[in-house]
Amino acid sequence: MIPLRILAPGAALACATALAVPQDAGAPPAGDAAPAVAKAKSFDATVADAIAKGVAYLRATQEQDGSFGAPRNVMFNESFATLHTYEAWTYATTGLGAMALAECGTTAADEVALDKAVDGLLQRPLPKRVSEWDTDNVWAYVYGVQAFARLLPLERFAKDPRRPAMAARATELIAALERWQTPFGGWAYYDTDATTIPPVWTTSFTTAAAVIGLLDAEKAGLKVDPRMLNKALACVAHARLPTGAFTYNVSAVSSPEHLEFIDQVKGSLGRIQVGNVALVRGGLLDAKVVKPGLEQFFEHHRFLAVARKKPIPHESWYAVAAYFFLFGHYYASEAIELLPTDQRAPFAKQLQQKLLEIQEDDGAFWDFHISEYTRAYGTAFAVLALQRTRRATASH
């Protein structure tokens, strides 16, 4: 909606004077503004339709127990996974699905699906460490915490009888993150080097995603140990390079290494946004870094695009893995919301266009095949990103 503005007397006089002056021959006819407005509204309607189709897909593919994703249609690239790996992925994907339904759903059927997802998050056992080297359980904690942190402040849950259980489960998830925080101060999803308790291997992007979830939890009134959060923020800050890229691994010395490595800007596109959002929201970076980070994202976007749907992780240029595509776009939408209002629309439009180009006929979005989790987490990431960009353009 375009806000109506009341003109001051002086402005009204100037406006009247301007109307009396003959129109410049080189200027477009005044009527040309109407098609431009109509075109903008039409594009926004297209985005809204894409969101609705994505939400309908999530609703149609939700499991009977309210969860999203399942170990069906397994491919060779997940031959390592065990039952507990799938339990962790299910919990994380259900958290994302719940957020998508809560933020993007518009119908009574969406409300029913959201209630089922919340029940699924409450009734499922808390995922435990998968094995000595597989710590995919961390993803369950990250998106479980964020889901409850986003749901609890909503009016529809203010008097919900499940509210105490939701807060209790969120507290459990926060405690689990604290238990599995590495000596570097962050988190990852494997521990291939030391296989210790707590794990040692740490990634910048898992840590940044966890930080954002914890900041959301604080905002929702949940208790978060400031020492844990500060260590995690310092960990993400340590991984940030002068180029604006974030190293994949967190190590003693952060370095971009060789010119075609994953820690160059072109290999870091899916990590830059989540890292910047975490550090800006956590108060360790000035918000002025957000715009250059988004400019890098779109300037080099082809390196994310060419990696999408490749079946082997990191087989693409700059070792980009396919699963960074929708992850990166989701956090890019959060980065856009950190920009000054008058700078958001151009980036929002670009992000919308990139996502609209890849939506499947059934409404799903996907980037990397992981059983039935692929389209569930991908669609949740995409509709959440599109919804945020609509907010950004509406505010503009």
Predicted regions and their residues:
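Boundary of Sec targeting at the N-terminus
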Residues: 21-23
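Active-site neighborhood of glycoside hydrolase catalytic domains
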Residues: 235
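N-terminal secretory signal peptides that target proteins for export/translocation
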Residues: 1-3
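An alpha-helical repeat/solenoid feature that recognizes helix-turn-helix modules
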Residues: 25-56, 60, 64-113, 127-175, ...
